[in-house]
């Protein structure tokens, strides 16, 4: 479970009810739209809580808590986690388990904002491409990446740059902060074969392909 924020449909409980799969929580940083301390309620069920070190969470089972910073790699059983950087707070996660690789960007994105000073936007661009240059994995099974509506015309800049560097079998749009993302003609022209999942509402579920 990455960056548990809110679950109005109680989907997590439903998914866990009849599942014997191991449960891991990942928290990329402390922002309220990425970190909900209510994740403690699954403390007995969860195998581990893997979090950026800027997240404060008290637990009865402190041994289940693992704090990371960008550059760290952690192995728990058959799970290998590498934390990459962010262009806001915290970090991003690359997770390998059971022959599958998942990337979750957290707040890693090309944060270009209309109306901000040009120097700030240029610095944001530089920081984003610097983080991308660190990625060694060129193919992943699933990638979760922001497409933030508040960025207006720059909404797709980050995800398109990411897709130039990494080829995910499935791209999951997240962090919409407004109107649901509908890929532009330019995006579809550049990436006509890219499989997408763009959730329509909180609680949407997609069955993963084996």
Question: Where would I find each of the regions flagged by the language model?
Answer:
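Beta-strand-turn-beta hairpins that frame and shape the catalytic cleft
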Residues: 1, 73-82, 94-102, 207-210
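Active-site neighborhood of phospho(di)ester-bond hydrolases with catalytic His/Asp-centered motifs
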Residues: 1-5, 21-33, 49-54, 103-107, ...
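Active-site environment of divalent metal-dependent phosphoester hydrolases
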Residues: 8-9, 30-35, 55-59, 74, ...
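Binuclear metal-ion centers of metallo-dependent hydrolases, dominated by the metallo-beta-lactamase
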Residues: 63-74, 87, 134, 155-210
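Active-site-proximal loop/helix segments of hydrolase catalytic cores
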Residues: 87-164
């Amino acid at each position: 479970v990455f960056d548990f924020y809110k679950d109005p449909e109680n989907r997590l409980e439903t998914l866990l009810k009849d599942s014997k799969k191991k449960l891991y929580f990942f928290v990329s940083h402390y922002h309220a739209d990425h970190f909900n301390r209510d994740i403690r309620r699954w403390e007995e069920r969860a195998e581990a809580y893997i979090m950026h070190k800027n997240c404060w969470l008290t637990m009865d089972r402190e041994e289940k808590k693992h704090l990371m910073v960008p550059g760290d790699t952690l192995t728990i059983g058959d799970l290998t986690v590498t934390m990459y950087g962010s262009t806001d707070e915290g970090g991003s996660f690359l997770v390998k388990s059971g022959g599958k690789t998942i990337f979750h960007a957290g707040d890693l994105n090309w944060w270009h904002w209309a109306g901000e000073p040009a120097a700030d936007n240029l610095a944001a661009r530089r920081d984003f491409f610097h983080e991308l240059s660190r990625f060694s994995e060129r193919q992943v099974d699933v990638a979760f990446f922001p497409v933030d509506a508040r960025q207006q015309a720059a909404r797709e800049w980050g995800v398109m740059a990411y897709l130039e560097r990494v080829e995910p079998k499935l791209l999951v749009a997240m962090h919409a902060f407004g109107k649901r993302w509908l890929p532009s003609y330019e995006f579809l022209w550049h990436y006509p074969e890219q499989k997408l999942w763009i959730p329509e509402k909180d609680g949407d579920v997609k069955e993963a392909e084996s």
